[in-house]
Amino acid sequence: MALTPTNLNNEMSLPMKMDCQEQELTEKNNSFFQKLNVTKSVMQDLLKEIIKVDYILDRSDDEDDISSENPQTDFLHKGMLELEAKHDQDLGKQDEQETDVDEYPQASTSLQFSKKNLLEFLLKDMLTLKGQIDKLEDRGLDLDQGTNTEVNARNEVYELKKKVMESLEDLCKNVELLSAKLRMYQMEGENTDSHSSEETDMEEMETLLPQAPASFLVQNSPPPNTVWKCALRIFIMFYVLTVTGLLCYILFFGATFLFERVLLRMLGCRTTWDLREMIEPFLNSEVEALLPS
């Protein structure tokens, strides 16, 4: 049987819908990665600003006094190095996550919304930290001021460094959670793809199978007349067999069993005796009496 236009349209619409969904997901992923690159650049600028402020503070002190009396700058150098190392690790994890998402563009959109919210939160934190650093630079730290202002500036920078470290740690945790969710969504997407492929195959097979004509179905289904005829034949055969069986029993064994037990239970005593009185002349008559004279 030839395919109808509706079946052809359904078959053509399935791959077109899949292509449109893939394009939408790739566009959303591209926008997400653009925002991610913006956050990377903001973080790099923030690190540069922190290093610049640290350099200004270190230059204001004498080298001997810094090594002997103020060990906070050494700790600050170590913290900045740790910060840069963690930043590099975060960038590596984000690049790996980017490659994973490019390989599987059919991940769920809910994961992308959570990533966008996280990036917006981090951008706000970065902008606030950068604003505080700009305020420190605008103050114009003078080299002739006392040690109290320098200690306060160092404490502020140290607090800023703590905030940046905490935000980076939160970023690492969130990236790990998002990667785990991404893997889970990838597994679910593979399962749904397998089920959808099976369903589409079944639908295609159903559309391709020719429909049986109505005349063929009518021929296979038996007409009601034949059903009634079969039932009537069975009833007649059963009736004939029962009557012949009773007649054979009466002929060879006698009618006492029928009149004393069977009919007595079915009809009652009075009707049974009346029936016997009606049939008694025929039972006692001889064959010669029935013959014509």
Curated annotation (Swiss-Prot):
The protein's name in its UniProt record: Single-pass membrane and coiled-coil domain-containing protein 2
Gene source species: Macaca fascicularis
Localization (cell): Membrane
Membrane topology per record: Single-pass membrane protein
Keyword Transmembrane among UniProt keywords: yes
The keyword Protein biosynthesis appears for this protein: no
InterPro entries assigned to the protein according to its UniProt record, in alphabetical order: SMCO2/5 (IPR026617)
Keywords: Coiled coil, Membrane, Transmembrane, Transmembrane helix
TM segment ranges: 234-254
Coiled coil, from the record: 116-188
Gene Ontology annotations for the cellular component aspect, listed alphabetically: membrane
